[in-house]
Amino acid sequence: MRSSKRAALLLTVGVLGIAGSLFAAGPVPKSEPNFYAPTGYFASLAQELRVAAKNGSTVSIVQLGDSHIQAGHTTAPLRASLQASFGDAGRGWIGWYALYGSNSPRDYRVTSSGFGWQRELILKPEGTRPMGLGGYVLSTRPSSRFTIGVTSSDHPFRQMHLVRTASSLPLTAFPLAELRTGRFSTGAYVVDTLSWRSPYTSVTLTGAEENDADEAVYAGCVLLSGKGGVLVHDIGINGAAYRHYALADYVEQLSLLEPQLLILSMGTNDCYSTHFQIADFTDSLEQMLMLVKEILPKTKILLTTPPPSFFRQASTHYVVTGRRRKHRKKVTTMTYRFNENAARVSEEIMRRAEQHGIAAFDLFSAMGGQSGINSWIADGLMAGDRVHYSR
């Protein structure tokens, strides 16, 4: 029971949400009541996947979201399933979260030595530097000496796309790589291409010894196998909501990955408030959809609803202890209340998907909503905060 539910959690958005209906030329069958897609919506994407498997082209899929995506658990089974069927084009996006002290997926590692990094997050878009593709931006002094180690043991790579601002110098690599610098910028950023003749699982990036650049600002990298197939990128920021990503400058950055499919997996942070207003959420969702359709007109969109969650509140009282009852022991009790807002957000997402003629997967309902979530708790598959989920 425990293992089957863990598998369901990991596979719901990925395999059940997409693969079960990706090749349906007609309406989605009633056997998948939690999934909506217009007739033939994924037909062109299905064809692109078949071509990639046969001719060595690449299909790019991006899953954008919050902490559930930053941890990598949700996207991993989707990547594994699609790459097993259509070819492994590489690990895809590598978030440099560790360089600012945050968590990251466990199938890659990014380290750094030298002068510390300063970061700005998309949670506060009024920052001093242009926001990067990963929902963060990292900077250090141009004169700083630093190295960055990138390791991807499960996905050997022959090529790396490195994202930096146009005013920052390219990084060099060891083992030595052929460097092709980006010529055209998307917003403030350009993409350099590092290529190796043999596949590697670990490389070191180094800043120039004599650096006369105006700044040293980097946003992350993409790892490619050098073969055709599928790239599945996971981009997430802890605490992110639709309102944080619904910015023209940010959506423009997504075009660097040339996604044929964009999976938007948010909603938990949008509705995790006792002051939640559905109208505010709808405005943010509509703004995001408008920007994606305008800036990425050829990209298919799949919305996923947030999983069930709980509000929690701590209460403190004191218990008199000791033989003479002169000592007081502090006792903290945690109480939980189901987050009804998640149900409202899920209903709104499914409704808006149908209105816009895009796809949506109701993860909230697939997990049983309020009535079904107790079994997840009983099996220990919810974290102590009853918002996040264990693996």
Please report, for each region that a protein language model flagged, where it lies by residue.
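Short glycine- and acidic-rich boundary segments immediately preceding or forming the N-terminal edge
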Residues: G20-E48
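Bacterial N-terminal signal peptides
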Residues: L10-S21
